[in-house]
């Protein structure tokens, strides 16, 4: 199996771990899935060649991942994101041709524990049936993505447990404790150190088999989709209250992320989260927080099997778990900071509870029309102009380390964005001055698209 360790391959092929989760899968279905799995290597190599998506050879895009069509159908409030060059599904649904996200109940038989400690589908990846999961996943993907040539974002949102043992702290510690109980029950005479070592190994290998195997199946069925997991990689730079907060990812986190090479190698896109916690309000630490989270994603992407893998951070327009919309400066610290580092784009996620009232829908529309939309036009236009001016239209502009505060935004002395009120896109007026070009050349450099090279991305070749 492509991308799996020997132990994970064994996990993949072995019979279901837990009899309680396998009755729903007929022998014919399981056998069909296993026959499909034997073709993965060939098909995945083919998928690598066939890849092409909504982000191909575009310097920066924004993708809408919010069900704001509800605002129109229920309250008559039209939150039109398309006029600001935001990619969205038809009727702005969570699942569609441009963007599909799978939550744990929507893809296969993901094992997890409830808040009260009850196991669902076996609870642990090493105690659940991967064959049963893939049989259900096969059907779920076909139902959610009926078009075989789907070329949008394909995001899997699994948050109950993390594939590295060391990252399962606090409420996720139950996955470590139950893993050790599983080993202890089989080997009651083993010392605690040996039990933990075996439990750690079993959990991590099974987690790899589940996560990599699910990606592989998606990539075989919809090879042009940008398959990846929400929230990966993480940086865990949440010590905001520290007086000398730098935002840097702890060394042990980077070391653990290095052990997830199988995940970065298997992903067709990386979707780190840069949601701004409420604790960052008024602290002036948001940019440092976002900067290092994006840097970590770019770091693991560059050393992966495909250094061109798109990085698409997830952004919220609200401070996390609040009803406070981000002010313009925080959009600069999140969307703007991401664009300046040369990511392929960003996903704008909106919780469904934000569209539950007419008032909240009206607030989102006003924010989109007055603040978010114009800023997206600004950043998207600046990224395109910089790509054409510096990178021959064949690469993205990436901020030079010597100018850590530089953002990819238009010079207001050279450009103006004129908003309309009749449903038409805003108009951008102006041209790059010689000074603008000189500033870009000083503060940014090029990261070439696949198939281009050279300082200015003007030469063919990898």
UniProtKB/Swiss-Prot annotation:
Residues 1-52 form the signal peptide. The active site is at 159 (proton donor). The keyword Signal applies. Glycans are attached at residues 98, 127, 244, 265, 378. The lineage of its organism: Eukaryota, Metazoa, Chordata, Craniata, Vertebrata. It is found in: Secreted; Lysosome. May have a role in promoting tumor progression. May block the TGFB1-enhanced cell growth. One of its GO terms (cellular component) is extracellular space. Its main location: secreted. Disulfide bonds join 71-361, 235-249, 386-397, 391-446, 448-457. PROSITE patterns: EGF_1 (PS00022), EGF_2 (PS01186). It is an enzyme of class 3 (hydrolase). One of its GO terms (biological process) is response to reactive oxygen species. Belongs to the glycosyl hydrolase 56 family. Highly expressed in liver, kidney, lung and skin. Optimum pH is 3.5-4.0. This is Hyaluronidase-1. Keywords: Disulfide bond, EGF-like domain, Glycoprotein, Glycosidase, Hydrolase, Lysosome, Secreted, Signal. Residues 446-457 form the EGF-like domain. GO terms for molecular function: chondroitin hydrolase activity; hyalurononglucosaminidase activity. Pfam families: Glyco_hydro_56. Its EC number is 3.2.1.35. It catalyses: Random hydrolysis of (1->4)-linkages between N-acetyl-beta-D-glucosamine and D-glucuronate residues in hyaluronate.
């Amino acid at each position: 199996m492509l991308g799996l360790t020997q132990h994970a391959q064994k996990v993949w092929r072995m019979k279901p771990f837990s009899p309680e989760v396998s009755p729903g899968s007929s022998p014919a279905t399981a056998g069909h899935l296993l026959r499909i799995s034997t073709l993965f290597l060939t098909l995945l190599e083919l998928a690598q060649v066939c890849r092409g998506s909504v982000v191909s050879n575009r310097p920066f895009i924004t993708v809408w991942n919010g069900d704001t069509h509800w605002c129109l159908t229920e309250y008559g409030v039209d939150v039109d994101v398309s006029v600001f060059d935001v990619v969205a599904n038809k009727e702005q649904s969570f699942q569609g041709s441009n963007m599909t996200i799978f939550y744990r109940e929507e893809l296969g038989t993901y094992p997890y524990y409830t808040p009260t400690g009850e196991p669902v589908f076996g609870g642990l990846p090493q105690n659940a049936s991967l064959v049963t999961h893939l049989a259900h996943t096969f059907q779920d993907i076909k139902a959610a993505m009926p078009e075989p040539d789907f070329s949008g974002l394909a995001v899997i949102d699994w948050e109950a447990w993390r594939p590295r043992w060391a990252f399962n702290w606090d409420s996720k510690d139950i996955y470590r404790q139950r893993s050790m109980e599983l080993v202890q029950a089989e080997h009651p005479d083993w010392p605690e150190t040996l039990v933990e070592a075996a439990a750690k190994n079993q959990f991590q290998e099974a987690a790899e088999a589940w996560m990599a195997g699910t990606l592989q199946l998606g990539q075989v069925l919809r090879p042009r989709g940008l398959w990846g997991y929400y929230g990966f990689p993480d940086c865990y730079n949440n010590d905001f209250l520290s007086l000398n907060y730098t935002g840097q990812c702890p060394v042990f986190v980077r070391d653990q992320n290095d052990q997830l090479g199988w995940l970065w190698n298997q992903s067709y896109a990386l979707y780190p989260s840069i949601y701004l916690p409420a604790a960052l309000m008024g602290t002036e630490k948001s940019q440092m927080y976002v900067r290092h989270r994006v840097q970590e994603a770019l770091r693991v992407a560059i050393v992966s099997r495909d250094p061109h893998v798109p990085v698409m951070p997830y952004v919220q327009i609200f401070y996390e778990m609040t009803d406070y919309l981000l002010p313009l400066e925080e959009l600069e610290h999140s969307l703007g900071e991401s664009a300046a580092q040369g990511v392929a784009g960003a996903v704008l996620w909106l919780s469904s509870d934000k569209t539950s009232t007419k008032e909240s829908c009206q607030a989102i529309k006003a924010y989109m029309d007055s603040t978010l939309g114009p800023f997206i036009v600004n950043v998207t236009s600046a990224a395109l102009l910089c790509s054409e001016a510096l990178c021959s239209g064949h690469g993205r502009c990436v901020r030079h380390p010597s100018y850590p505060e530089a953002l990819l935004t238009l010079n207001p002395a050279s450009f103006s964005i004129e908003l309309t009120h009749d449903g038409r896109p805003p108009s951008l007026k102006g041209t790059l001055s010689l000074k603008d070009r000189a500033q870009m050349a000083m503060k940014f450099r090029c990261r070439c698209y696949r198939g281009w090279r050279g300082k200015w991305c003007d030469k063919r070749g990898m």
